[in-house]
C-alpha cells in the first residue's frame, strides 16, 4: 500500500481550493484508501492461490486415469467399483489434449500417449483437416487458451478450417458458433437440458444438425477470425443475448420454431463465461494467459508436439 498517496492528493490541489473542496478531498482520500486496501487483499489472495496450485500441480496423480494397456486417459473413474471407465479420450482434436500435454510435460504419463491419440483426416476447402468427435469449437480451440499450436502445424490448420466451417454453418440472420451448451428444452426439474452440438462437416460422429449457438464458442475463435467474431457478437446483442452477467448461454434456432423465432437460453454457466474471459484476455492483452502458461519450464519440453505437420 502506498503510504504517501494522501500527500500526492494534497499536492494536486492548490492551497486556495483546499478549504472549498475539503469534503470532496476527504471522500477522494477515503476512496483511494479503500482501493489500496482492496488491491492489497487481492494480491495476498493471488499469492495464496498460487501456492495452492503449485502444491496441487506437484501432487496430482494421473495414474488412476491412465490406461497402461491402451496408453490413453480414461474419461473417469467408477467410484462405486473403484475402476477406470472403459471409455477413453482417444482423439487429438479434443479439449482433453490440454490434459495430455500437461501430464506429459510433468512426467506423469509417457510421451508415447500423444501418438496413441487418433488423427482421422478428411479434406475441406481443399485442405487437410483433422476431425474432432462432435465438430465443436470447444474441442478445437479450448486448449489454445493456454498453449497455441505453431502456425502451419496440423493442429493450427485444422483449427483454422474448423472456424471457417463454423462460420458457414450459421442461422439465416448470420449467427454462428457451436459447441456443447444448454438449449431451449427442460428436464423434469425445469432446468435447461445440456449436450454437445457441432458442425457435421468437421465431426467423426454422425448426428442431426441443430443450430444452437453459444457466445463462448464464437469468442474462442477471436484470434482466428477477429472481425467475423465481433460482427457475430453484434448480431447476438441485437437478438437480446445480453444480461446482468454478460451474454446468455445460447440462442436456440431449433427447439423454438413453433413459437416463430429463436429461443434464448436465459442462464449463465461459469466455465463458459470463464473461457470467454480467457479468450478475451489473450486477445486484448498480448496473449497474457498463454505467455504465463508457456513460461513454465515444463511446458517448453512439450511445445515441439504442437509443431506436428
Over which residues does each language-model region extend?
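Ser/Thr/Asn(+Pro)-rich, low-complexity disordered segments
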Residues: 1-309
Amino acid at each position: 500500500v502506498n503510504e504517501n498517496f494522501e500527500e500526492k492528493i494534497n499536492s494536486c490541489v492548490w492551497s486556495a481550493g483546499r478549504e472549498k473542496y475539503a469534503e470532496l478531498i476527504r471522500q477522494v482520500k477515503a476512496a483511494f484508501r479503500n482501493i489500496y486496501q482492496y488491491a492489497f487483499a487481492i494480491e495476498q489472495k493471488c499469492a495464496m492461490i498460487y501456492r495452492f496450485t503449485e502444491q496441487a500441480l506437484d501432487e496430482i496423480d494421473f495414474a488412476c486415469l491412465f490406461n497402461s494397456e491402451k496408453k490413453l486417459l480414461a474419461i473417469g473413474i467408477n467410484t462405486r467399483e473403484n475402476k477406470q471407465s472403459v471409455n477413453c479420450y482417444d482423439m487429438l482434436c479434443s479439449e482433453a489434449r490440454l490434459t495430455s500435454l500437461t501430464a506429459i510435460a510433468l512426467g506423469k504419463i509417457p510421451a508415447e500417449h500423444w501418438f496413441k491419440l487418433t488423427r482421422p483426416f478428411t479434406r475441406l476447402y481443399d485442405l487437410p483437416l483433422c476431425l474432432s468427435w462432435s465438430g465443436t469449437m470447444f474441442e478445437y480451440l479450448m486448449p489454445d487458451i493456454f498453449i497455441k499450436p505453431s502456425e502451419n502445424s496440423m493442429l493450427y490448420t485444422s483449427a483454422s478450417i474448423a472456424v471457417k466451417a463454423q462460420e458457414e454453418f450459421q442461422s439465416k440472420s448470420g449467427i454462428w458458433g457451436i459447441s456443447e451448451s444448454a438449449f431451449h428444452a427442460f428436464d423434469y426439474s425445469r432446468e435447461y437440458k445440456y449436450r454437445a452440438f457441432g458442425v457435421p462437416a468437421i465431426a467423426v460422429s454422425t448426428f442431426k444438425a441443430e443450430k444452437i449457438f453459444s457466445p463462448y464458442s464464437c469468442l474462442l475463435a477471436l484470434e482466428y477470425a477477429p472481425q467475423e467474431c465481433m460482427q457475430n457478437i453484434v448480431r447476438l446483442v441485437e437478438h437480446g443475448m445480453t444480461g446482468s452477467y454478460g451474454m446468455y448461454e445460447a440462442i436456440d434456432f431449433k427447439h423454438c420454431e413453433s413459437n416463430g423465432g429463436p429461443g434464448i437460453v436465459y442462464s449463465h454457466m461459469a466455465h463458459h463465461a470463464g473461457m470467454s474471459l480467457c479468450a478475451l484476455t489473450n486477445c486484448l492483452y498480448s496473449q497474457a494467459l498463454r505467455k504465463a502458461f508457456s513460461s513454465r519450464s515444463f511446458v517448453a519440453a512439450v511445445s515441439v508436439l504442437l509443431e506436428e505437420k
